[in-house]
């Protein structure tokens, strides 16, 4: 850091070394770099929720699905997916592609 005096001479040098004017010393500006501290930001994660599905097992499921399948509003087979029920219902009729 370099400094220099801004004092002016006090005029003729008196017997006593004194001066009535203020003496100022000015130095160059200093630069300071302040690094910001790291900031931790917590973002909320996704909220995952699950809903239990109603499931049924055994013959009740096959009977329910079997009663949904129908032709002309009449269930194909109310007892499940038996081949005998399909054959008696479609005897003499043309089957449509799936």
Swiss-Prot record:
<comment type="similarity">
    <text>Belongs to the avian keratin family.</text>
</comment>
<protein>
    <recommendedName>
        <fullName>Feather keratin 1</fullName>
    </recommendedName>
</protein>
<keyword id="KW-0416">Keratin</keyword>
<comment type="subunit">
    <text>The avian keratins (F-ker, S-ker, C-ker and B-ker) are a complex mixture of very similar polypeptides.</text>
</comment>
<dbReference type="InterPro" id="IPR003461">
    <property type="entry name" value="Keratin"/>
</dbReference>
<dbReference type="GO" id="GO:0005200">
    <property type="term" value="F:structural constituent of cytoskeleton"/>
</dbReference>
<dbReference type="GO" id="GO:0005882">
    <property type="term" value="C:intermediate filament"/>
</dbReference>
<dbReference type="Pfam" id="PF02422">
    <property type="entry name" value="Keratin"/>
</dbReference>
């Amino acid at each position: 850091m370099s400094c220099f005096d801004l004092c002016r001479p006090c005029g003729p040098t008196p017997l006593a070394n004194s001066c009535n004017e203020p003496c100022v010393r000015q130095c160059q500006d200093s630069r300071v770099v302040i690094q910001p501290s790291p900031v931790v930001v917590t973002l909320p994660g996704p909220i995952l929720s699950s809903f239990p599905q109603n499931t049924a097992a055994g013959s009740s499921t096959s009977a329910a699905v079997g009663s949904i399948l129908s032709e002309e509003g009449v269930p194909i087979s109310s007892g499940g997916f038996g081949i005998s029920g399909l054959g008696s219902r479609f005897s003499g009729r043309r089957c449509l592609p799936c």
